[in-house]
Amino acid sequence: MNGDVIHVAAGSYVPSVPLTGMKTALDNTFEIHSNFSMIGGYPADAAEGAVADPVANETILDGDHAVCHVVAVTAAKMNGMKASLDGFTIKNGSSQFGSVGSTTIGGVKFYQSYGAGIFIGNATVDILNCKIVDNTDIRMGAIRVDAGAEALFDNCVVADNATKSTTTYNCGGLWADGAKLLRINNCTFSNNKASGVAPCIYVFGDTGGKTNVLISNTTISGNSVNPEHATLNGGGIYVRENGNLVIVNSTVYGNHSGKGGGIAVYGTAAKPSKAVIVSCTIAGNTTVTAGNGAGLQQAAVGGAIEVYNTLISGNTTDGAADDVAWFKDASYKVANSIIGGTVYNADGMAVAGAAFDPASMLSPLGDNGGATKTCVLLGDANPARQYGMSASELKILGETLDPAFGEAVSAIDQTGASRTGKTVIGAVVK
């Protein structure tokens, strides 16, 4: 019922009831059909007053490699209400080859072949302190966030998900299509794979229209197109038609694809896309095809990019620097940022006498405090410590963007350290 709270003890649970409108065992799912909360992580022998601890008391929603969606969120939107899922491991969802059945709930088609871990329809939902791991899908992600959805993923891990086939099926991690607003905060996306484009995060309003995504304080690492393919884009994030991304205080590291190993942006005149990148570190990403932006790729004239207070360096193709590829005549802006070895001021002009060396001035990905792994700056004479934006400038910028972020985000770095009194480029001020 709406408003209910369900407390779940540690253990492994397999769904046994089909999704509304479906009939087969393949369609069995844990359906969040109303705006209630489910909280996992309680001891198996919990007594009155027990406190949830999902690390000590793992609570698993297990598809057992036999269901299309482990969790389906179908709750109708209601003013002042939302569904929530807190403290669960969601694993072993397995959408099937040849599965083309669907049911329509709240105006959204729940296809069997989409969203093996979680399928979010036209609902308002918080996914908190969850692990979404080891799900396999034909296409469209271990997580599917569909048209009209308003969803938050906070303090979650999305890892080791994959598409099944060596045929080019897209997106092993999360696919947002038509989301009214998807927010991702304090999350880790790692080691997701796809045989097509966007092995990790796909922001593509393919059928659902404009898709709004805000990513903050998140690390996206080690995701890859597999098997390797020279022309497939977006190892970490791929923003396509109708996609609208703002990413802030985040690290995109060690991802791999044919082109645009870290982030790729593609749009058309009829269906433009946009990515705004603020206070991020994009490093250690690789591509197969040289000259196509191992760190950041602008793949078409309809894909606009704005880069602020961001470090993009140490990205390579076959060992050679290949940080950014701009598309001819496309719209882009760079301010208070570093690309490769060049430092840019607020007007997008190179700073004379300032140079950045990723080998000696930036650490590999590691544990540096905070909820996620990051890279830290090395050396006191590092230009990334000098030419960035102030906390007040970042506050003003964040409030003007769409989706916007407030001072709670702009005033700190990815680890939670204060930006006050500093003008540091990148995700971490240390």
Predicted regions and their residues:
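Extracellular beta-strand-rich solenoid/capping regions of secreted or surface-exposed proteins
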Residues: S16-S37, A46-G87, K91-T124, I138, ...
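Solenoidal tandem-repeat scaffolds enriched in leucines and small polar residues
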Residues: A162-T163, G172-W175, F189
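Predominantly extracellular beta-rich ligand-binding scaffolds that present long acidic/polar faces
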Residues: G3-V5, A9-A10, S16-S37, A47-P54, ...
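Intrinsically disordered, low-complexity Ser/Thr- and acidic-rich flexible linkers and loops
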Residues: G98-Q112, S165-T166, D206-G209, N226-A230, ...
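C-terminal accessory segments
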Residues: H65-A75, G348-K430
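Active-site-proximal beta-strand/loop segments in catalytic clefts of secreted hydrolases
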Residues: A9-G11, G41-Y42, D64
